[in-house]
Amino acid sequence: MSRSSDLFHKAQTIIPGGVNSPVRAFKGVGGEPVFFKSGKGAYLTDVDDKQYIDYVGSWGPLILGHCHPKVIEAVDNVLHSGMSFGAPTELEIQLAEKIASLMPSIEKIRMVNSGTEATMTAIRLARGFTNKNKFIKFNGCYHGHSDSLLVKAGSGLLTLGIPSTPGIPQCITEHTLTADFNNLEQVAQLFEKYPNDIATVILEPVPGNMGFILPKIEFLKGLRELCDQYNALLIFDEVMTGFRVGLHGAQGLFGIKPDITTLGKIIGGGMPVGALGGKREIMSFLAPEGPVYQAGTLSGNPLAMAAGLATLKEIEKINFFEDLSSTTNKLTEALSDAAENANIPLFAASLGGMFGFCFTDKNSVENYLDVASSDEVLFKKFFHAMLAQGVYFAPSMYEAGFVSSMHGDLEIQKTYDAAELVLNQLKSA
């Protein structure tokens, strides 16, 4: 028995399911999860001393790779001064100013501890500001695990095949309306049905928890217009896409300003973090300046602020995103070429340092159903065979993958060689 397997069995006796987040349990691919002990650059090492090229990157935060020296130095500099004070620090201001200077829609920002906190607070703020209760989300979009947002959600809920979750009363979700991603007509119909009741529309501008799906620009523009028409707020959940698809987020890339933006992952440089920001008059509705309450013991803690600030300073450097996008494109091209050589249909796409692929003969993937109809059995076989070759992809076909600045031509070539070997073996099996 491997040490990973031994640890997993031990973990199951004390931790529900043996993991502290469902997708880690490998339910989406079968088998037992790998336990890791260290990471450096583009690589992870497991507890059995096997090394892997890492395309998960802690689910997005590690855009600079594992243990980047600038991030380690920044954390070390504050570590010895105190890990948390429960009081304001100058680092909070510095990170807030840096984010606001880069994210087009943000004039004020509130730091929290996770993406879930950020989206939960954003919905509360939108309801308080508009004095309306209903909101629209999209089937398969995942916005964390707060009660009102766990309706037809993505991420681990898709892996487990659960459309919602027990433990949430109907009275909480009755104000949550859903539509299909990239379907503007459905959104318009909801606004027509509830013209005075919808506080906000929330979406991942580039979904990454129901597979990797690129938005139609007309869809995003249409959402902005509908929200303006019906006096509703538009929330971009950029926890995943913020500083991942481009220096100014998805909103900068597509030229569309939301009213509220939620952030996480990269702005903490690998530390637990979240944030929400937006127009000054909306953000001023948050306590203690306004009536909408939100609080957090560890919000703005020095370690996360230091790691996030160091990360943002690195990704600001000239050609950072040009190089990152080039590497990610090379990866998806390599996967596509390997599949084509094996005569196996595969769709792959990328944006910035974010990518996804699924085994389908479709020429485009536009919503959750397109991903769900792809070959999940083949994905599971491919995942495990690539893992055996030392390539670690997300253990679910519903999760996006991530490339860091530490991935280079060597890692792409190794991935291509492994994929070509694996896909040809699967084809002949």
From Swiss-Prot:
Biochemical pathway: Porphyrin-containing compound metabolism; protoporphyrin-IX biosynthesis; 5-aminolevulinate from L-glutamyl-tRNA(Glu): step 2/2
GO biological process: protoporphyrinogen IX biosynthetic process
Superkingdom of source: Bacteria
CC per GO annotation: cytoplasm
Keyword set includes Coiled coil: no
A GO MF term: pyridoxal phosphate binding
Residue positions where N6-(pyridoxal phosphate)lysine is found in the record: 265
InterPro entries: 4pyrrol_synth_GluAld_NH2Trfase (IPR004639), Aminotrans_3 (IPR005814), Aminotrans_3_PPA_site (IPR049704), PyrdxlP-dep_Trfase (IPR015424), PyrdxlP-dep_Trfase_major (IPR015421), PyrdxlP-dep_Trfase_small (IPR015422)
SUPFAM superfamilies named in the record: PLP-dependent transferases
Keywords: Cytoplasm, Isomerase, Porphyrin biosynthesis, Pyridoxal phosphate
Pfam families in UniProt: Aminotran_3
Family to which this protein belongs: Belongs to the class-III pyridoxal-phosphate-dependent aminotransferase family. HemL subfamily.
PANTHER family: GLUTAMATE-1-SEMIALDEHYDE 2,1-AMINOMUTASE, GLUTAMATE-1-SEMIALDEHYDE 2,1-AMINOMUTASE 1, CHLOROPLASTIC-RELATED
Name assigned to this protein: Glutamate-1-semialdehyde 2,1-aminomutase
Gene this chain is encoded by: hemL
